[in-house]
Amino acid sequence: MSNTVAVTGGTGFIGKHILASLLSRGYTVRALTRAPRNDSTPHLTWIQGSLEDKNALAELVKDARYVVHGAGQVRGHNEDVFTQCNVMGSLRLLQAAKEGGYCERFLFISSLAARHPELSWYANSKYIAEQKLAAMSSGITLGVFRPTAVYGSGDKELKPLFDWMLRGILPQLSTAETKLSFIHAIDLAQAVAQWVSSDVPQAQTYELCDGTESYRWKDLQAIAASARQGPVRLIPIPLYLLKIMADISTRFSLLAGKEPMLTRSKICELTHPDWSVSMQNAVDDFNWSPGISLTHAIHHRLF
């Protein structure tokens, strides 16, 4: 029986950890890449193409018993940018997997943001993708991961925040009582491999974090103060200033021919009051538990 896992998003910072985790467990991996790669190995084959390329997707999922869909659009200046990749691209991949005839399990890496689709274009696109994938997954076990904020080696989004924390400055982007949560990319990758390896994977949605249900800004302040052995100043950033920053980011990104990360739509996610996580079903269903707490990561600079 095939031991092949087809992976999208393998060139991204999370995807690189997923590839490493799967390879360490002895799986043969076939991964999608937009740019040509010359680093294939006996157990890792790169397929050049994109989620818009049906021929590449057919080659990607050929003989693959498992599909891990980690590719996604996280930057964008309008709703359509997210819909085309996160919704339509996901549906094309599942359709290719069904037509290939070998796929038994399909894992969609969504986002905790999908819990509140009304917040942003990104959140809504992930939620819609979840619903549409579920509707067309007959005959294939569909798993959905909703990881919270992911950080780790290669991350460019949370690293600046952690760097400033260790310099003694912590920008507070929402109210003091906001519930935050985090997960290290290594733990997320191990959760992926554990789900794939499970004897009886459940068709279920899983929220994932580092084991701490929620942090508040004062908790981050205390973690950073302990790590740097010095004071950390917590500086609230007013909403109007975040909006100005988002407008500037959007304008300059588009002028540079790039999609912006910080937009007014994204601000609604950043300032949402509750990103707490309950992950007991992941522990119960496929015996996964995280190994890297935020405290450990900050103290040992694992980002």
Segments the model singles out, each with a brief description of its role:
Residues Q48-M88, A96-E99, A113-H116:
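NAD(P)H-binding glycine-rich loop region in Rossmannoid oxidoreductase-like domains
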Residues S198-M261, M279, I292-F303:
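Mid/C-terminal beta-alpha module of Rossmann-like enzyme folds, strongest
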